[in-house]
Amino acid sequence: MPSFKVTLINETEGLNTTIEVPDDEYILDAAEEQGIDLPYSCRAGACSTCAGKITAGTVDQSDQSFLDDDQIQAGYVLTCVAYPTSDCTILTHQEEDLY
């Protein structure tokens, strides 16, 4: 099973960490298993609490039901239902920037 390097960045939170995430595990779950505290609420892709923004790489977030096409095109991702499909970099704690 392939895994990918996911870099999680948020200057305000002092976060700049790269973790290995299997391609069948949600990024939020993998981060928590490695002791990284990211925001979340529903864990089902139905709200925006866990929103991040991809600056490099790709994910599969087909389970999400909250983001519209424009937000997805802009790079927003819900980490609670996002599987990595390549090495990627995600700016975390982006909920306020969605609106």
UniProtKB/Swiss-Prot annotation:
PROSITE patterns: 2FE2S_FER_1, 2FE2S_FER_2. [2Fe-2S] cluster binds at C42, C47, C50, C80. Its cofactor is [2Fe-2S] cluster. Keywords: 2Fe-2S, Electron transport, Iron, Iron-sulfur, Metal-binding, Transport. Pfam families: Fer2. Binds 1 [2Fe-2S] cluster. Residues 4-96 form the 2Fe-2S ferredoxin-type domain. One of its GO terms (molecular function) is metal ion binding. Transmembrane segments: none annotated. One of its GO terms (biological process) is electron transport chain. Principal electron carrier in NADP-photoreduction. Belongs to the 2Fe2S plant-type ferredoxin family. Forms a complex with heterodimeric ferredoxin-thioredoxin reductase (FTR) and thioredoxin. This is Ferredoxin-1.
